[in-house]
Amino acid sequence: KELKADNKPFDEAQIREKVRAEQKTEQSKFRDAAKTRATSESKQNTLQRITAAFGTTCGKIGILIAMACVIGRCMLASGAAERIVRAALSVVGVKGAPIAFCSSSFLLGIPVFFDSLFLLAIPLVKATWLKIKKNYVLFVVALVAGGTMTHSLVPPTPGPLFVAEELGVNLGTMILAGMAIGLFCSASGLAYAYWINKRMDIPLRESPEEMKKLEELAERDINELPSLGLALLPILLPVALISGVTIYKSGLDPTITIHPALNLLGDKNIALTLAAALAMLLAASRLKDRKLLAEHVQQAMMEGGLIILICCAGGAFGAMLQQSGIGPHISSMMGSEPLDFTLLPLAFVVTAVIRGAQGSATVAMFTAVAIVGSLVTDLEALSFHPVFLAVAIGCGSKPFPWMNDSGFWVISKMSGMTEKETLKALTPMATIMGLTGIIVTMIAAKLFS
């Protein structure tokens, strides 16, 4: 036992008092340091601080987002994305179509942004409905359950990518943790899809002309599409390279230097660039006119440029929040005890509130990581890995989607459901998935701390 100056042991009350005093001292140091930094930075030119934060964010995620846009666009153009969905359907059959839609959208949600993914897959959902004339709500909700989770938990989509960079989480670690926890979330969403399908009988609302197109799509020869192996390659290659090197490094003695070539291939920018090159080659092999490839890549870059600008603006906004001293203010409201495990539910709630208020899951994640990140002076001092904090923020971006969310309208209009039907089918499912995610995240953080 620890001894006092008179060589007598402390009693339990004295030990608790000593620990409490040390915690208050650490918390005071954090607040003083944050206030000092905010005061120092406030003396600098405001525009310089904004542009510096903007540029730093662009340097972290600019190439990744651009390459992800190229991968997604080229996979759509080449038919690779459709091939993956059809392969899943062929394995499980029409009876297992909900599982096929959920699993394939979960996988495609890694490189393809959710809106594009939904626009691609909803015709296949409708074509499948034509074969059995039932379970339309089940198919639509299952499709959303898969793609929406990887959109918020697995890089290189902007939200989880930005959160991982801000919290200093290795990209491979974020991919592995996001996919693992995302599986539980999507499973809960799929369970809700089966439940709500029994309570909502919605027919397919399409014109005769559209019905004819859907019938043609359902009868499309699979040989017109790329092979499954080639279709999966642009997705699996970066995941394997980035995650593989991360796992390999974690098992090495810290004194051992990894081979430069392996380190290079496992670099996130290199891995995504290689995947983009493969996706472009695949699209070039399927498109009759090479000029079409240039148009698709140009369109991808235009989309990527807009997303990069939004992300960098979010990074600058986050930096301004941190420099405002909001962290110490929130910390003081939470009491004198240093925040640790309570950061996980706090991050979830903060993100969920912001998501419900303004609609965008990505913007909610950008804002929340700035607020929550300002509460922590040393991420390594946490009792759990920072990846769980990143995942908690991602899960918090799921609850309460409604009419202020662009994704809500994409799902509503493209599926043919009314606003009331979409609210009934979508909002509870997304909320359940978010709650499932934070529960699993907290359990995992305890188990692996």
Region roles according to the model:
Residues 1, 19, 65-72, 104-108, ...:
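Hydrophobic core segments of alpha-helical transmembrane domains in multi-pass membrane transport
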Residues 1-67, 83-91, 241-313, 329-337:
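Hydrophobic transmembrane alpha-helices of multi-pass solute/ion transporters
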Residues 41, 76-81, 91-95, 128-138, ...:
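Juxtamembrane helix-boundary/capping and inter-helix hinge elements in multi-pass membrane proteins
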Residues 62-68, 91-124, 311-314, 337-375, ...:
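Hydrophobic alpha-helical transmembrane segments of multi-pass integral membrane proteins
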Residues 94-109, 132-152, 172-179, 183, ...:
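Alpha-helical transmembrane segments of multi-pass membrane proteins
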Residues 132-134, 173-218, 395-449:
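Juxtamembrane and boundary regions of transmembrane helices in multi-pass small-molecule transporters
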Residues 176-296, 449:
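Long, contiguous bundles of hydrophobic transmembrane helices that form the permeation core
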